[in-house]
């Protein structure tokens, strides 16, 4: 009897294993036969001094087999067709193209005019402007290859009716900030303040000064007073990633949500408003 019971138990165990294997094969077949999204990615122009496209190790490192772009760039490129913009004078925007200025280089006056005119004619731009960037770099201060320490777009911001400042009362530079449903971590974030006559742009200042949503002519500019939040040190959370497979902070989710709101030409409400 005991022998028959053991044989019966093994039989049911074998049946259970076969059923589990069939279930896994069905899942694999479903995953491989799901329709692939063939829609083209929205175009996104990018101007930045941050090491997002390439590493800081020089051309040898960039050409190495294991060279890889920054994780923030990899995340964005999964959803956008990212194109570097080197020369604003010769730049020809594609239809419905967004523009991301992430702590960009200093622009000549004629380039600032080009940005302003493009936005007024219906352009959509997200600007990450940091008053005191802490992003680590291999290059010394003053080296053109180093990310820009402070935003140089003050003339454009003033024309649109806002001013970027660094709050002096922050005793702890690294801070957790809540923007609506997004919990982010960054360092030395700035603040937007209204400045002078804002007739050239209508800007709503949100999230305790961290965001400004500006209607400029027929277009729109969303301004975030920080760029360090793109650094993986502030959002990836390797220990948390090992345990959950998710980011520790929602920095990249915020970036994607801002671009999506800009693309849909919707105001920053809903998820961006503190409940």
PLM feature spans:
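Short, surface-exposed patches at the edges or C-terminal ends of soluble domains, predominantly
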Residues: 2-275
């Amino acid at each position: 009897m005991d022998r028959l019971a053991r044989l019966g138990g093994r039989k049911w165990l074998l049946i259970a294993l076969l059923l589990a294997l069939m279930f896994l094969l069905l899942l694999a077949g479903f995953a491989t036969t799901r329709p692939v999204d063939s829609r083209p990615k929205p175009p996104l122009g990018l101007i930045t001094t941050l090491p997002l496209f390439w590493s800081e190790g020089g051309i040898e490192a960039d050409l190495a087999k294991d060279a890889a772009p920054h994780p923030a760039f990899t995340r964005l490129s999964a959803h956008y067709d990212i194109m570097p913009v080197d020369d604003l004078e010769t730049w020809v925007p594609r239809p419905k193209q967004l523009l991301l200025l992430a702590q960009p280089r200093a622009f000549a006056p004629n380039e600032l005019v080009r940005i302003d005119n493009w936005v007024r004619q219906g352009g959509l731009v997200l600007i990450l402007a940091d008053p005191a960037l802490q992003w680590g770099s291999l290059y010394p201060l003053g080296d053109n290859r180093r990310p820009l320490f402070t935003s140089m777009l003050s003339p454009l911001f003033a024309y649109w009716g806002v001013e970027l400042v660094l709050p002096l009362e922050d005793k702890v530079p690294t801070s957790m900030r809540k923007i609506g449903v997004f919990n982010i971590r960054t360092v030395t974030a700035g603040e937007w303040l209204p400045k002078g006559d804002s007739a050239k742009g209508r800007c709503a200042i949100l999230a305790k000064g961290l965001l400004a949503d500006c209607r400029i002519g027929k277009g729109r500019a969303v301004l975030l007073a920080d760029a360090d939040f793109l650094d993986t040190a502030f959002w990836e959370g390797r220990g948390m990633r090992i345990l959950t497979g998710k980011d520790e902070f929602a920095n990249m989710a915020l970036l994607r949500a801002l671009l999506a709101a800009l693309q849909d030409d919707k105001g920053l409400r809903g998820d961006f408003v503190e409940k």
